[in-house]
Design a protein with these regions (language model features):
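Conserved ABC ATPase "signature" region
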Residues: 49-80
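H-loop/switch region of ABC-family ATPase nucleotide-binding domains
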Residues: 146-147
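Helix N-cap at the start of a conserved alpha-helix in ABC-type nucleotide-binding domains
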Residues: 121-123
Length: 195
């Protein structure tokens, strides 16, 4: 178990304190699947609303809120799903809803914790490409925790390998070799390489 900090703040300190500049995409989506997509996307703004505003958004989002959600969904290729029940979407679509939820926060830093672990290879590549496109277009900092070395090699320009809380590699994916992978992954090396 590790800790992450940003802008001089320990990410574990002051639980409950809202770090508005940070957006998090979780491995398990963390969506309320019984709700419509629009409500899950707008949940990214809950921290900036009053209790009454939050309840109003849940009952009937205002036109401006719907437009915010529509724009975020358009950025991830799901504009037509704004009123869909989230449970009716595929795993890849649900992960895109989770990304849209982060986009409405407009964070400067996006932390993605194994964002494609539960997805098939094609969908995983599509989701990573979406994240990277949004990072480039929006000037965001993107930090992705991912263990699939094949996906890392195909999609990222920089890799930082950690073992026991210390950096053991910081370089280009092309420079990852068997020795470095053995240092990073130990006994799980084959699983990480094959995905």
């Amino acid at each position: 178990m590790g800790r992450v900090g940003s802008r001089g703040r320990d990410g574990g300190a002051g639980r409950g304190h809202r770090h508005g500049d940070d957006g998090v995409i979780y491995q398990q989506h963390n969506l309320v699947t019984q709700l419509r997509v629009v409500h899950n996307v707008l949940a990214g703004q809950l921290g900036s609303w009053s209790t009454l505003g939050s309840l109003g958004s849940l009952v009937a989002p205002a036109a401006a809120q719907r437009e915010t959600a529509r724009q975020a969904l358009a950025a991830v290729g799901l504009e037509g799903q704004i009123d869909a029940i989230t449970a009716d979407l595929s795993g890849g679509q649900q992960q895109r809803v989770a990304i849209a939820r982060v986009l409405v926060q407009d964070p400067t830093l996006i932390l993605a914790d194994e964002p494609v672990a539960s997805l098939d290879p094609r969908t995983a590549s599509d989701v990573l490409e979406t994240l990277l496109r949004l990072q480039r277009q929006g000037g965001k900092t993107l930090l992705v925790s991912i263990h699939n070395v094949d996906l890392v090699r195909r999609h990222f320009s920089r890799v930082i390998g950690l073992t026991d809380g210390r950096t053991v590699f910081d370089g280009r994916p092309d420079d990852l070799n068997e020795t470095i992978l053995a240092t990073i992954y130990g006994a799980q090396r084959a699983e990480a390489i094959e995905g």
